[in-house]
Each structure stands twice: as C-alpha cells, then as structure tokens.
Amino acid sequence: SHKMAHIVTLNTPSREDWITQLANVVTSPDELLRLLNVDADEKLLAGREARRLFPLRVPRAFIARMEKGNPNDPLLRQVLTAEEEFIVAPGYSTDPLEEQHSVVPGLLHKYRNRALLLVKGGCAVNCRYCFRRHFPYAENQGTRRNWQTAMDYIAAHPQLDEIIFSGGDPLMAKDHELDWLITQLEAIPHVKRLRIHSRLPIVIPARITETLASRFQRSSLQVILVNHVNHANEIDGEFRAAMAMLRQAGVTLLNQSVLLRGVNDNAQTLADLSNALFDAGVMPYYLHVLDRVQGAAHFMVSDDEAREIMRELLTLISGYMVPKLAREIGGEPSKTPLDLGLKQR
C-alpha cells in the first residue's frame, strides 16, 4: 500500500528532515561546481562575483538531480551565478511588479477578492531569475506581530475569500507557525480558500511532513498548493511521494513555471514537463514569460518566440495539460494572458 512505501522511504538518507537540509544548503559556486564535476572555465569563474548581487543558495537534494559534468544542465542554470547578471539591461527594473503597495506590513491586497501574505522572506533555493531578488523583505518581515495585523485586515475586508501565502517561500515557516496562521484564517468566515505558492516541495520534498499534510486535511479551508517546477528533471520519486500525500489530504495541486532561455525554451521540454507533472498529480497552470528584473535578462525569451513555442506545444499534448502563457505587469492587479495569435481555422 501507499502508506508502507512511504514509511520505507523515511529511512533513506535523503529523507533527512527539511530543517537539517536547509541548514546544509550549498552557498559557494565553487563547491556547487565541484559536486557536479564541472570544470570552472573563465566564464563560470567570472560568474562567481554575482553572488554579491544575490547570494547563491541550493539544497543538496536538488543538486542530486543535476547531471554530473554538464555545465549546461537545466537545473544548474536556474541556480548558478552568472556574469550576465551584471549587465544593466535597459527596461529591466529592480521592482518589476511595483509591489510597494502593501496595505499593512507583509500583506499585499492587489486583487479584489484575494490578498497575498508574505509569510517568510527567505527561500530554500535562490533562483537567479527571481522577480523578488530586490524585494525589501526587512520591512515586510514575517513576524507574529505583522501576521496578527494582517489577520485583522483580512477579517475587516469581507470581499477577501482567498488568501495567498507567498514570500520568499511560505513553507520556510515551520509547521507550528503554519498551523497558527491556518487556525486564524479558519476563524474568519468569509475566507474560503488558502493558496500556497512554494518552491520547497520540489527542491526539498521532505518539507511535506505528515504533520503538515494532516493539518491541511483537517482544515475547513480549501487548500491549493502551487508548485514551481521548470523542468521535468526536477521531478523525482520523493516529490511524487510528497504530492501523493497531499492529494490524499485533499489538496489541489497546481504548477507554475517560468519560460527560461537555456532551461525550458522549447516545446518538447515543456511537453515532457507537463507529462511529468500530470503523472505526479499536479496540473500545469501558468507558464510565465520572465519579469523584466535586473540581472535576469540573459534568461529572456521574446514574446514572439514564446507564442511560437506554445503553438507547437498545443500539437504535442492534450489541451488540459497546456499551461496558460502569462505575464505579470507592474501595477496591473492580475496576470495578463498573452494572446497566442491562434487564427480561427
């Protein structure tokens, strides 16, 4: 049975508890390349300095899924510092989404019926293309006091029926903190849904603890987890086991990806990703074109290219497995779908 299989996996070394794994993340570009047997050429060495712009952070469980000896591995490319980050690209900003509009510290009420709570500032992994790499986390700290203020605001605004836990990464909060937050939300009658956006379940699958899954299962809220997976190689048996646990707990599982040059910028790669996600019980939901954030221009795929890739993707997989192509536009309250330019036949 499922349960037995799960218990067996708990004893393998990779099932170290998530907090231990978090304490042991790799922060040195040199160590990362050494672990992967990748020789640091001039270009890779020059990239080391980019950690001054935004530190390198990668969990070992994620490194284990990278291909040894391949400097162009799609998982490595997402996390390795690159000299291109120093290029000051015109039209790329440090706050592409103009997120300074928080109503109380750590709470953004950008949409009529939903608000975004920045539960935690940090992440388990630093993605080089991150749109919050310049975010002023210090003044939006996830503290019990800020959370209480946010809860008061949510309780006072009956149009809010969905709360989004974001960050940083909201699953950096410990189980007891999440329990407290969920309990507060359950006491507010107009809140129906809790959506959690997290990269932790994919980079450290052990983050999905039995305690957390059973808390979701007991909740009177509908819980939605939006994973952030960009490439099929990220998905392994541990991630699938974590998703199975959440499915049994009644959690709705979605995924959003970012279209990244050199990582997943072709239709077959995206088809493989959709298939691997769906196999794991996760629905592909959004594919974002990159936010124009300083330091990430080298990942950019043009809108025309993106449309071309999507048109091809539609021929490779079932329609329900095709993610929506979208962009976040600063100051716009919600995601803007990109028209694929599909002519009516």
What is each stretch, according to the model?
Residues 55-58, 101-132:
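N-terminal pre-triad scaffold of radical SAM enzymes
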Residues 141-149:
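Short cysteine/histidine-rich metal-coordination sites, predominantly Zn2+-binding motifs
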Residues 148-162, 171-317:
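Conserved AdoMet/S-adenosylmethionine-binding subsite of the radical SAM
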Residues 307-345:
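C-terminal accessory regions of radical SAM enzymes
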